[in-house]
């Protein structure tokens, strides 16, 4: 899980609370019931707005990466100069990963060359940091556009392709994810390079995650079932996972109110 807070009311205090949850995603009592120790279960990263990176870095150990949403999130329609500057500032502030937002207009206008050049420039600005290209699948109109945008972003240097900002009317689902996974597989067959996949938006239950895990396993195989190549972007998913583990260990569900969210 990329444990995420990307709301208009985000504050330093809210990020600090999220980081505490990231450090202890499952309560100590529940870990004991499961026969696990603190550190056995860890989030993939903490994802925040670029201006809150320092706050996240201050409250997290080095083994938990901080991902910053940059490039005019969520619309991706700021000027190119401004969006590129956000990447530079995010890295200066300590971001380990950069989630970029593509300009969906390039896709809708079939301007694939411009999309390639922009993502390649963002990759160059990010230097050695991993970038996740957010396609905004709900805005791309057709699955053919989703497929083409996926391939262009991978060719331009994206380390991950991500379904959504979470702000669109249509976010990650099995249909658009299948298309993206098929493109990842095709790219791997052509180049030998593995690209990561990040579904995001509306994923709030463990049951839904299992469906995505099965899809990734069927399309790409076991090598992709790890944080290096698979992340789930979510803000409330961890609460449901903890409830399911509670049920597994104790035979009953805990009320959500009794599970710490930060």
Annotate each PLM feature:
Residues 1-6:
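Generic N-terminal amphipathic, Lys/Arg-enriched alpha-helix
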Residues 9-41, 50-197, 204-235, 243-262:
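Alpha/beta enzyme core
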Residues 240:
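N-terminal beta-loop-helix "entrance" segment that forms/cooperates
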